């Protein structure tokens, strides 16, 4: 029987990896002051999240093997998981600067912490480099070492393309709803979120166990990308319709001029009069204008449209999971576990 990891177990691996990263920097005689800065950046930016992406690597590996992982297997899988968390940290530190964000995980964003400022850009680069330091240290002799390397490089580029499309489609200071479209939205969510959050952890587990045949990778991608897309649509829905006490934050997509699923759905069904209301009120840092949009979303019955989308999408995903060929080591349960975590979530 497979075994699910806990956050506590997963986090217990981090100190060893942090030590390896600091030792690597020490070997270059990085001065003490800079070493402690690097340590602080690693801890503040990598720890403190839910670690869903990282924990998906050992979880998927255990399902694929059909048993709990040995200590050595767990360490390997969790190390790959922490590399996905480092990738996430690199993206978040950078994104927060680009978006002029204020808080992250309930604290001021890294670049807004005392004495950090634009040094955060270099810190983000160092978080990305840490992935490859760990990969070399622990997987240099793994038969799929080059595949691991290429996977991280490819997924990083895919995420950056998604971010570029997002930044140019919805600049915060210039509202132009003609720029929005469901096609652009789909591109953004697939590349900015789905690849690194859903495909990457499972592909890493498959490479680790050496069952990443082209057929298995294709089957995984064909299910995990729609799953990631559904997850992001859900996120956009919760930003407006979720309860702040559930989602742990107050939604800001409307004021931030976000190219979200809700605004794109609205644009596809509005009357000319409602379109004018959208144009005049969307993407403004103004509570009253935000309230006008929220009312419009209610008038358009976007909650019902979302629920219809959810049932259709989940139905399609379930069909794909049922059709998986398990003869080459892939397991339906990997995907059922992902779907189970996100279907009808409220946060």
Swiss-Prot record:
Record: residues binding dimethylallyl diphosphate: 104, 192-193, 232, 249, 258
One GO term (biological process): mycotoxin biosynthetic process
Residues the record lists as binding isopentenyl diphosphate: 50, 53, 88, 105
GO cellular component: cytoplasm
Cited Pfam families: polyprenyl_synt
Metabolic or biological pathway, per its Swiss-Prot or TrEMBL entry: Isoprenoid biosynthesis; farnesyl diphosphate biosynthesis; farnesyl diphosphate from geranyl diphosphate and isopentenyl diphosphate: step 1/1; Isoprenoid biosynthesis; geranyl diphosphate biosynthesis; geranyl diphosphate from dimethylallyl diphosphate and isopentenyl diphosphate: step 1/1
UniProtKB keywords: Cytoplasm, Isoprene biosynthesis, Lipid biosynthesis, Lipid metabolism, Magnesium, Metal-binding, Transferase
Main function: Catalyzes the sequential condensation of isopentenyl pyrophosphate with the allylic pyrophosphates, dimethylallyl pyrophosphate, and then with the resultant geranylpyrophosphate to the ultimate product farnesyl pyrophosphate.
Name assigned to this protein: Farnesyl pyrophosphate synthase
Gene: fpp
């Amino acid at each position: 029987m497979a075994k699910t990891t806990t956050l506590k177990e997963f986090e217990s691996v981090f100190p060893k990896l942090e030590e390896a990263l600091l030792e690597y920097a020490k070997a270059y005689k990085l001065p003490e002051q800079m070493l402690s800065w690097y340590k602080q950046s690693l801890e503040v930016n990598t720890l403190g999240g839910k670690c869903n992406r990282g924990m998906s690597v050992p979880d998927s590996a255990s399902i694929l093997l059909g048993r709990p992982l040995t200590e050595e297997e767990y360490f390997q899988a969790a190390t790959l998981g922490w590399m996905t968390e480092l990738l996430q940290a690199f993206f978040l530190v950078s994104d927060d600067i680009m978006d002029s964000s204020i808080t992250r995980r309930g604290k001021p964003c890294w670049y807004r912490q005392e004495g950090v400022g634009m040094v955060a850009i270099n810190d983000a680069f160092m978080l990305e480099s840490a992935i490859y330091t760990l990969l070399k240290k622990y997987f240099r002799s793994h038969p799929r070492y080059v595949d691991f390397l290429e996977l991280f490089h490819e997924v990083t580029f895919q995420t950056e393309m998604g971010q570029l499309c997002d930044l140019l489609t919805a600049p915060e200071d210039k509202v132009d709803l003609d720029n929005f479209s469901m096609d652009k939205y789909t591109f953004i969510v697939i590349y900015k979120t789905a690849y690194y959050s859903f495909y990457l952890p499972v592909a890493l587990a498959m490479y680790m166990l050496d069952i990443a045949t082209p057929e298995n990778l294709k089957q995984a991608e064909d299910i995990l990308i729609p799953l990631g897309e559904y997850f992001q649509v859900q996120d956009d829905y919760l930003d407006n319709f979720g309860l702040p006490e559930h989602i742990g934050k107050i939604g800001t997509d409307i004021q931030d001029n976000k190219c979200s699923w809700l605004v794109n759905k609205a644009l596809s069904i509005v009357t000319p009069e409602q379109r004018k209301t959208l144009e005049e009120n969307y993407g403004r840092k103004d509570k009253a204008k935000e309230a006008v949009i929220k009312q419009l979303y209610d008038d358009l019955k976007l909650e019902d449209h979302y629920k219809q989308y959810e049932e259709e999408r989940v139905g399609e995903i379930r069909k794909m999971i049922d059709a998986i060929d398990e003869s080459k080591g892939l397991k339906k349960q990997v995907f059922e576990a992902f779907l189970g975590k996100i279907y009808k979530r409220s946060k």
